[in-house]
């Protein structure tokens, strides 16, 4: 959603945290992060469940001449199973909206439910970068996630914008 869209500055910062040949973004959204990842990674896959948004982003990437980004519309877990390949990095920006609960802040309440899917994700990548809301309790996040290597607190003009969780198997 628009309110979760990364700014150019935060997307550029995220791109400095990854390296290698391949990255899959399981929660593609508007693709701002993927555009910057594509400057550092040879092949980026933008996976977005919303058909209309996926089409718009694919069109925008063509206009931006971002030839190393592929757009796949569909459920990210099914996409991982279908592709059945290892990635150097996986990026996840879970939706912090829940139909039943409204706006949520615990990782287990987000979509996808990263804590429940972590073992599944590790089958496809040993390095995972997760973006969360700055209001997420870091202690709670550490309890929900395993293998946390680094937590980045990203701020612009003295305002915390997001937390980035580097997780390695």
Task: Annotate each PLM feature.
Residues 1-169:
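SAM-dependent transferase fold signal centered on methyltransferase-like domains
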